[in-house]
Design a protein with these regions (language model features):
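Short, well-ordered beta-strand elements
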Residues: 205-206, 212-221
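Short, small/polar residue-rich loop motifs at catalytic or cofactor-binding pockets
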Residues: 199-201
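Short, surface-exposed loop or secondary-structure junction motifs
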Residues: 1-189
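Solvent-exposed loop/turn segments at secondary-structure junctions
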Residues: 28, 222-223
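Composition- and surface-driven signal marking solvent-exposed, interaction-prone regions
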Residues: 42, 133, 146-147, 217-219, ...
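Short, gly/Ser/Thr-rich active-site loops of penicillin-recognizing serine hydrolases
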Residues: 136-139, 150, 155-163, 224-265
C-alpha cells in the first residue's frame, strides 16, 4: 500500500503520450491494483485460478512457494564490471545497480511478496506453454484460457519504432506485450508480428505467429554489457532464419500485430 500511495502522489514529468518510456516495475502496481479491485481477488489467486490451475502449471505465479525454493536457480552478476556502464544503466531503468538487483531477486522476502511487474517464477517450459496458448487463440488442451478477442486486442500496436527513454533502445509496443520489428527488432530479424517480453537482463519470451513458434529464454547470468552479446544476437538470428514462415491461412489465430487483420478491431 505504501508503494501505491507513493505512485498516486507522483507528478507526471511530461504530458501523457508525449514520450515512449518503459516502466519496469512501477506500472505493474497500478495494473495489479486494477485487477484486484475489479475481481476482488489478490493477484496470486487471480493468476492461479485463471492461468496456473487450468493449464496445470505448478509454478507460474507471483513469488515462489516454499516447497520449490530449494530448486530455484538464483541470479548471478556477470559480464563486464558493473561500473563500466551497467550500474548507471540499471539505476536508470530499475532504480538500483546490478548487485543490488541480483541480491533483491535472490532474497527469500522477494519470493514471499507480490511484485506485479517483477517476480513471476516459472520454468522455460511453462513460459513456453503460456505463449503456445496465446498462439492457439487462448486455447489449451480443449480449455479456453483467454478469449481470442482479448489476445487480438492485446497485440494491437500502440506505437511505431521509437527510442524508449527508459531502455534507451528502439522499441515497439502493443497494448499488452512488446512487439518485434522489421527488418530487425527485439526478437531478431523480420519479427514484425512477434509479441512477447524482455525480462531482467537476458531473458526473452515471445511468440511469432508468422513462424508458428514460441520461444522462452530464461537465464540467471545478469549483465548488460558482456561477451555474451554476439552469441545472443546470433541465437536470435538463427531462430528467425531456421524457422520458416508459414502461410497466413495456416496460422492458429488472428493477432493485432498482423497489419492485414482488422476484422476484430
Amino acid at each position: 500500500r505504501s508503494i501505491l500511495r507513493r505512485l498516486y502522489a507522483a507528478r507526471p514529468v511530461s504530458p501523457a503520450g508525449n514520450h515512449l518510456a518503459y516502466h519496469a516495475v512501477t506500472a505493474g502496481y497500478i495494473l495489479g491494483e486494477i485487477i484486484e479491485r475489479v475481481t476482488g481477488q489478490d493477484l496470486r489467486q487471480f493468476v492461479h485460478e485463471t492461468i496456473e490451475k487450468p493449464m496445470d502449471m505448478p509454478y507460474f505465479n507471483y513469488g515462489l512457494k516454499p516447497e520449490y525454493r530449494a530448486e530455484v536457480a538464483l541470479n548471478c552478476a556477470t559480464g563486464l564490471h558493473p561500473r563500466l556502464g551497467t550500474d548507471h544503466y540499471l539505476n536508470h531503468v530499475l532504480g538500483g545497480g546490478l548487485q543490488l538487483a541480483v541480491d533483491v531477486t535472490n532474497d527469500s522476502r522477494f519470493m514471499d511478496t507480490i511484485c506485479p511487474a517483477g517476480n513471476i517464477y516459472t520454468s522455460a517450459e511453462q513460459a513456453g506453454r503460456f505463449f503456445e496458448m496465446l498462439l492457439s487463440g487462448g486455447s489449451y488442451q480443449g480449455k479456453q484460457i483467454l478469449s481470442e478477442k482479448t489476445i487480438f486486442r492485446a497485440t494491437l500496436p500502440t506505437t511505431g519504432v521509437n527510442i524508449d527513454r527508459t531502455l534507451l533502445i528502439p522499441m515497439r509496443y502493443a497494448l499488452g506485450p512488446m512487439l518485434g520489428s522489421n527488418p530487425v527488432g527485439l526478437f531478431g530479424p523480420m519479427t514484425g508480428q512477434a509479441f512477447g517480453h524482455l525480462g531482467f537482463s537476458n531473458i526473452l519470451c515471445w511468440a511469432d505467429p508468422e513462424r508458428d513458434i514460441s520461444v522462452s529464454l530464461l537465464t540467471t547470468g545478469k549483465s548488460v554489457v558482456g561477451t555474451h552479446l554476439p552469441a545472443l544476437a546470433n541465437l536470435l538470428y538463427q531462430i528467425s532464419i531456421q524457422c520458416p514462415r508459414i502461410p497466413r491461412d495456416q496460422r492458429r489465430s488472428l493477432f493485432g500485430s498482423d497489419s492485414h487483420e482488422t476484422d476484430l478491431v
